[in-house]
C-alpha cells in the first residue's frame, strides 16, 4: 500500500515539475477547448496557424488575431479549420475538425500545417469585395 501511495505522489510531483517548467510558455493544464486563453494564442497559433481561433474572419477575409493588421490577410476557405486544443503536463494536443490529431511536447514544439496548400493570401488589388446593386441579389 505504501508503495502505491509513494508512486502516486511521485507521479504528481513529476507532473508539477513539468507544468512549472513550461508555465512560462503556456502554464499548467488546459482542458479541451475551442477557445484557448487570449494570452496563449501566440503559442497555439505559431505551431498550427490554420486553427479558426487564430483568425478574425469577416466577409470572407481573415486577419490574424495574434499579429493583427500587420500580418497578411487570408481568404476564408478550407485552410481555416475548427480546432480544439488541450494541455496536460508537457503534452500539447490539437484536435482538428476532421478528427486529425497533432500532439507535441509543449516545451519542444514543432510547427505542423498539412493545410498550407489551401492557404490563399488576400491582396487588395487582386481580390476586391464586389458591391452588389439591388437588382443583383
UniProtKB/Swiss-Prot annotation:
Signal sequence range: 1-20
Official protein name in the record: Protein MGF 110-7L
Keywords attached to this entry: Early protein, Glycoprotein, Signal
Coiled coil region boundaries: none
Transmembrane segments: none
Top-level taxon: Viruses
Family indicated by similarity: Belongs to the asfaviruses V110 family.
Amino acid at each position: 500500500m505504501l508503495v502505491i501511495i509513494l508512486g502516486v505522489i511521485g507521479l504528481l510531483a513529476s507532473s508539477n515539475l513539468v507544468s512549472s517548467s513550461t508555465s512560462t510558455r503556456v502554464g499548467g493544464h488546459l482542458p479541451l477547448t475551442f477557445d484557448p486563453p487570449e494570452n496563449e494564442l501566440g503559442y497555439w497559433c505559431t505551431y498550427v496557424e490554420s486553427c479558426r481561433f487564430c483568425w478574425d474572419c469577416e466577409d470572407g477575409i481573415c486577419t490574424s488575431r495574434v499579429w493583427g493588421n500587420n500580418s497578411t490577410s487570408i481568404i476564408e476557405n478550407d485552410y481555416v479549420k475548427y480546432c480544439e486544443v488541450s494541455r496536460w503536463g508537457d503534452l500539447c494536443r490539437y484536435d482538428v475538425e476532421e478528427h486529425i490529431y497533432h500532439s507535441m511536447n509543449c516545451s519542444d514544439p514543432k510547427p505542423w500545417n498539412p493545410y498550407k496548400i489551401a492557404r490563399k493570401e488576400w491582396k487588395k488589388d487582386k481580390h476586391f469585395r464586389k458591391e452588389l446593386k439591388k437588382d443583383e441579389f
